[in-house]
Amino acid sequence: MKTMATRKRCKLSRTGPEFENVIKRLLCARTFHTRIGGDLTHGIINRGRRANAEQMGLQGSAQHFNIFPLDLWTQGKKTEVQKREGTDSIPAAGRSGTANQPSIAPHRCLFSRGITALDGLKRGRGCNGAAHLVRGDAWKTKLGEPWVSIALALAGPGAILILELSWFLG
């Protein structure tokens, strides 16, 4: 049964200004699936707090995911296992063929968060919280072809919120 807060959060008008807060709408969704068959709902609801391997639908030992997995890809932090083994590799996080994936450059972190595009300018916040502006389609080249972005049309003629779910989608 939904709580009062969940009910209120899920009753958003598609034409009203509150619709721009797409994160609230995403939190209403029951399930997010990945290609590896994982259920991402709990990982999204955690909103940056610790998520275990089971919550994220990942294969492998839970000790490899002792912090929110996105941090491993965006900030290059080492897990306790990496520190103990003296390795710079990052756990594959359920992906095939990426057992020794190196740390991804910080600019990818910017595009792993919500980004608002208005009049050709992409606005977002990087891992360090600093605001960034990227003109045109530069974000596409930085992310690379395998990454998938979901664009949602919002209220207003030029407003688009791009929610980067590519890390989860593989």
Curated annotation (Swiss-Prot):
Keyword flag DNA-binding: no
Domain of life: Eukaryota
Name recorded for this polypeptide: APRG1 tumor suppressor candidate
Organism of this sequence: Homo sapiens (Human)
Broad class of where this protein is predominantly found: membrane
Membrane topology: Single-pass membrane protein
Transmembrane segments: 150-170
GO cellular component: membrane
Location of the protein in the cell: Membrane
The keyword Signal is assigned to this record: no
Keywords, in A-Z order: Membrane, Transmembrane, Transmembrane helix
